[in-house]
């Protein structure tokens, strides 16, 4: 597959991931994650297990997740890097959080499927 085709696949997977996150269905979300997936944010590193446990318990829910910029996708063989500005509305332990973030996701193609292995979020600077 050429890089354009692979980039289109990654774009589709990223959109499907956003829909899965908003569904608040831990099994559906897990289907997009590699077993060793981690998320890096201002608070540190969260593992796949930690993230999914928050979703399963209902402590973390999402009402919206929308791309706010055209993504930048680069494919390097069976690895892809996806960067986009994303807005989302989440509730964490009952408190609403509206976020405007730059996200970087690293995907690896395994057994013909693109899976997230790492995600990093950075708040967009005000102004």
Task: Map each language-model feature to its residues.
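A beta-strand edge to alpha-helix "cap/lid" segment located at domain peripheries
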Residues: 1-127
């Amino acid at each position: 597959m050429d890089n354009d085709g692979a980039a289109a696949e990654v774009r589709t997977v990223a959109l499907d991931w956003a829909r899965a996150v908003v569904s608040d269905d831990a099994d559906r979300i897990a289907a997009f994650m590699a077993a060793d997936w981690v998320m890096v944010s201002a608070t540190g590193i969260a593992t796949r297990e930690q993230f999914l446990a928050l979703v399963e318990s209902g402590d973390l829910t999402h009402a919206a997740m929308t791309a706010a910029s055209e993504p930048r996708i680069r494919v390097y063989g069976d690895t892809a890097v996806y960067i986009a500005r994303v807005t989302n509305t989440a509730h964490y332990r009952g408190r609403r959080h509206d976020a405007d973030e730059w996200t970087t996701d690293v995907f690896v193609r395994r057994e013909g499927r693109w899976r997230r292995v790492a995600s990093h979020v950075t708040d967009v600077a005000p102004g």
